[in-house]
Amino acid sequence: MSIARRTTLSKFLIEQQRETNNLPADLRLLIEVVARACKAISYNVSKGALGDALGTAGSENVQGEVQKKLDILSNEILLDANEWGGNLAAMASEEMETFFPIPANYPRGEYLLVFDPLDGSSNIDVNVSIGTIFSVLRCPDGKQATEESFLQPGTEQVAAGYAVYGPQTVFVLTTGNGVNCFTLDREVGSWVLTQSNMQIPADTREYAINASNARHWYDPVKRYVDELNAGKDGPRGDNFNMRWIASMVADVHRILNRGGIFMYPADKRTPDRPGKLRLMYEANPMSFIVEQAGGAATTGTQRIMEVQPTGLHQRVPVFLGSKNEVKRVTGYHDEAK
């Protein structure tokens, strides 16, 4: 791809704004600011031990998870980049117990930004791909946000995306008009369009799940995975491969490129906790992206984006990816009711 013919993220968004007329200028600017923050996070991640940002920070987030130094730094980068631009009413993050209203000394906009600043951070110290996930909603109360302002189903998202900090740094985005992938050109500092209209194959022979939890699974999940593992001699009549990175952004990015199903089910260890992944800033944005790429995403019993949130840090079971496999495992849950 010649430099002269490259489409940068800024150019892509401006063209979308002109062609479809459904990408408001404030939303375009917000996406560009988030992408710029992801560049800064990528830079800090890539420094590794040289940047004195590896290891734990000696604190826990609202979920009781030990925070890594890069968790906190990435959260601060996203807050600092977005608080002053005038596009947001408030932000919410995995790393903060409550929402962050835009300070009174800055102009406020009509959007809400929800994010997981560094997904897969347990992999930081071993140099496995990690990333940032974000979701954008309109503030129903204008520019004066409350916690309830965020509690909208995923169908209300106006944009969602993620960045993967791996061998290449990529930024995947949807505004409800397909899914596109941009790769960071570090020499010039630009996001360059490298994949357009990404599509997930309807069928797959790959699945992603943490098999070490198999003894805790409920029957529908156990039935589904047992059938996959039975291979050609089993009821599916085909061989399946398991892939598990323990980094949602990396697993979903693989599925977006070559198909597969990602599963993080609820299990019997904590019957009162419906799953581990957070609805607002993990499941919803990833579901929006996957559906826009022709895939499906459910909790096992309902479409993820139709779940009505009850809290910023609500958890849900997640089954997403290739449409026919998601349909099958969801059907097994229906049969077990």
Curated annotation (Swiss-Prot):
Pathway the protein takes part in: Carbohydrate biosynthesis; gluconeogenesis
GO molecular function, one term: magnesium ion binding
Binding site for Mg(2+) 2: 116, 119, 282
GO cellular component, one term: cytosol
Keyword match NAD: no
Keyword list, A-Z: Carbohydrate metabolism, Cytoplasm, Hydrolase, Magnesium, Metal-binding
Homology family: Belongs to the FBPase class 1 family.
Protein name as it appears in the record: Fructose-1,6-bisphosphatase class 1
Organism of provenance: Burkholderia cenocepacia (strain HI2424)
